[in-house]
Amino acid sequence: MSTTDKIVYLNGNTLKIEDLINIGYRGYNVSITQEVEELIQKGRNVIDDILKSEKTVYGINTGFGLFSDVIIPPDQVKMLQVNLIRSHSSGVGTPLTPERTRMLLALRINVLTKGYSGITLETVKRAIKILNGNCLPLVPEKGTVGASGDLAPLSHLALGMMGEGKMYDFGDSGNTFTSNLDVDVLEYRNFKFSPANEILKRQNLTPIELNAKEGLALINGTQLITSLGAEAVYRCKVLAETANIITAMTFEALKGLTAAYHPLIHAARPHSGQGRVAAFLRSVLHSDQYPSEITLANKDTKKVQDSYTLRCVPQVHGIVFDTIDFVQGIINTEMNSATDNPMVFDTDELCGTISGGNFHGEYPAKALDYLTIGIHELSNISERRLERLVNSQLSDGLPSFLVNGGGLNSGFMIAHCTSAALVSENKVLVHPSSADTISTSSAKEDHVSMGGWSARKCLNVVENVENVLAIELLAACQGLDFRRPLKTTEPLEAVYQLVRSKVTFMDKDRFIQPDIEEVYKLIRSGQVLNVVNSILNKK
């Protein structure tokens, strides 16, 4: 894969999470090289040879699942593929967003470029034009059991490309839309849907016409799990870094002790993530380079150690970083894996097909369940830090609920309740979906991954964590205001100023939800992380 002038060149081997985010959220188009075209054609030649030989091969001239022993006559092999897509388009629920639909389609194209699916080059080229033209099928998010692949959502994707079902209708915008990863992330977008054939015609595009094996090639794979998982990993990486910054803000508001972050402590327990978090906290808290007036004024404190929610942050946040790194490796591999069945080979050892189980979603399912558990812990500990900010018995001099005139004003009282509610919700959502399996297809497909729900609930938890951390950051800035005129370090002052550019000090009760939303946007868009990095990178 290479990226040039907002074009991602797909080859089935080197696509990265950032590339997929660029395609989904930043409007990058996709293309393939002549070398990839030749690889796709090589795989298709194997299928054409099988058709000429009149051999019986699963998925080419047989039924599917329980009907795999039913032989399909040559004049019906194309209808077999059309029927497959129509019957398998059985999903329900909220449609995937335009961004996630783009990621889903791009990822499916990427695995097809490996040449193991036997799809025609013409179909791949049409799929690329459909993606680049933002002709995005309506894909319900529910309905996959994660083996044999994400059949229902990928069937809806294929159905739209066939000119059936519905597609997003962006009206007079030239079939473009404003993405919501980086700007106005909570802006309501009232998209409508129109018949797929009308959208394709409007863009002067021709629907895909399925040949033998092609319906199966378009739907047999883990691309829903993996594309949603890629977004989850991307957001978790930003979120984990931002959580360290927010922790430091709270640390300063609570007049924490930096001794617990001493490098000798973390060298004695050399987990990668733990050392990484401790080093970061040392880089933004009081130092010769970045002095903190709050820390200097507190140097004669009689306190000898902080609570666990401050003292043990490297140990708690650290494993989250290691979890993200592990899951990223699984997702990157899955993004570039052939997940079709049967798979097509043209080698010295074999020229033909082999039936296998690469479509089984257990790898990304288990990984994303693990990621969900890991990223949730950031909200668990954040809510406890928030309790210390709003509880005057724990906050070293801050007013109850971070507001003057308590009684008449309630301050952050119910913002803390919101945080607690989200954390409680997460504690249910972290139950691993992949611990379950239900036999399907008359016990032919008798073990499944349930990875679709693993991916979707991971994103649900990520959003909850983003909001919990937004509330903590808002409260930490309020706490720092009560420490004025003393200031914190330069990197943390930059975060404070960023927040205050959107949300003013709460001198009395006001409608607080818009404040939370503004800070949520700063976190989700990466602005909090960027403002700190811009200072640290000057060193």
From Swiss-Prot:
A Gene Ontology BP annotation from the UniProt entry: L-histidine catabolic process to glutamate and formamide
Q: How is it modified after translation?
A: Contains an active site 4-methylidene-imidazol-5-one (MIO), which is formed autocatalytically by cyclization and dehydration of residues Ala-Ser-Gly.
Going by the record, the broad EC class of this enzyme is: lyase
The terms describing its cellular component in GO are: cytoplasm
Which Gene3D superfamilies does the UniProt record give?
Fumarase/aspartase (Central domain), Fumarase/aspartase (N-terminal domain)
Q: Which reaction does it catalyse?
A: L-histidine = trans-urocanate + NH4(+)
Per the record, the pathway is: Amino-acid degradation; L-histidine degradation into L-glutamate; N-formimidoyl-L-glutamate from L-histidine: step 1/3
Cross-link (5-imidazolinone (Ala-Gly)) at residue(s): 147-149
Q: Which UniProt keywords apply?
A: Cytoplasm, Histidine metabolism, Lyase
* Sample GO molecular function, one term: ammonia-lyase activity
Q: Which InterPro entries match?
A: Aromatic_Lyase (IPR001106), Fumarase/histidase_N (IPR024083), HutH (IPR005921), L-Aspartase-like (IPR008948), Phe/His_NH3-lyase_AS (IPR022313)
Q: Which residues carry this modification: 2,3-didehydroalanine (Ser)?
A: 148
| Subcellular localization(s) per the UniProt record | Cytoplasm
Q: What is its EC number?
A: 4.3.1.3
In the record, the note on similarity to other proteins reads: Belongs to the PAL/histidase family.
- This protein is called Probable histidine ammonia-lyase
Q: Which gene encodes it?
A: hal
